[in-house]
Swiss-Prot record:
Coiled-coil ranges from the UniProt annotation: none
A Pfam family recorded for this sequence: HTH_7
Catalytic residue list: S12
Name this polypeptide is given: Transposons Tn4653 resolvase
Role according to the record: Resolvase catalyzes the resolution (a site-specific recombination) of the cointegrated replicon to yield the final transposition products.
Family as reported in the entry's similarity comment: Belongs to the site-specific recombinase resolvase family.
Species per Swiss-Prot/TrEMBL record: Pseudomonas putida
Length: 186
């Protein structure tokens, strides 16, 4: 049964170009998530999983665009292929159908493990770079949401009993950020 070719694209940040991932690839519909790969709650991935039917092919630029770790990758590939949906990874040149040979399953495991390893190396280099920048005094981290004066006012008003949700809205911060300010004294 010949179905539709459906694309899945994931970009980690809003400045990445999602079109680049499936350029020159014919697909009838594309689902695009702007979220981290480690976040398994991706609305467009969930929509794709609900949308695809037996005979369809899901086209993904590379394995690391679908999942950041081997367990999630295997689970998603198995979930799709058990429903009669093919999955095609362009960068790796691999297609999975559910009737895969032991060699294809080995390739899925090896390539998925390499993607996971590569991500771990990137995170390690990022941490090392931040540590070096901190030593040189060049890294200051994220800009604070509130000035010291605003933070002091926030603490006073929260201590006085004003509703925290109202304060968060007024200061234009999330409630989690509000609670972080209330936990710290700086």
């Amino acid at each position: 049964m010949q179905g539709h070719r459906i694309g899945y694209v994931r970009v980690s940040s809003f400045d990445q170009n999602p079109e680049r991932q499936l350029e020159q690839t014919q697909v009838s519909k594309v689902f695009t998530d702007k979220a981290s790969g480690k976040d398994t709650q991706r609305p467009q991935l969930e929509a794709l999983l609900s949308f695809v039917r037996e005979g369809d092919t899901v086209v993904v630029h590379s394995m690391d665009r679908l999942a950041r770790n081997l367990d999630d990758l295997r689970r998603l590939v198995q979930k799709l292929t058990q429903r009669g949906v093919r999955i095609e990874f362009l960068k790796e040149g691999l297609v999975f159908t559910g009737e895969d040979s032991p060699m294809a399953n080995l390739m899925l495991s090896v390539m998925g493990a390499f993607a996971e390893f590569e991500r771990a190396l990137i995170r390690e280099r990022q941490r090392e770079g931040i540590a070096l920048a901190k030593q040189r005094g060049a890294y200051r981290g994220r800009k604070k949401a509130l000035s010291d004066e605003q933070a002091a006012t926030l603490r006073q008003r929260a201590t006085a009993g004003e509703p925290k949700a109202q304060l968060a809205r007024e200061f234009n911060i999330s409630r989690e950020t509000l609670y972080q300010y209330l936990r710290t004294d700086d």
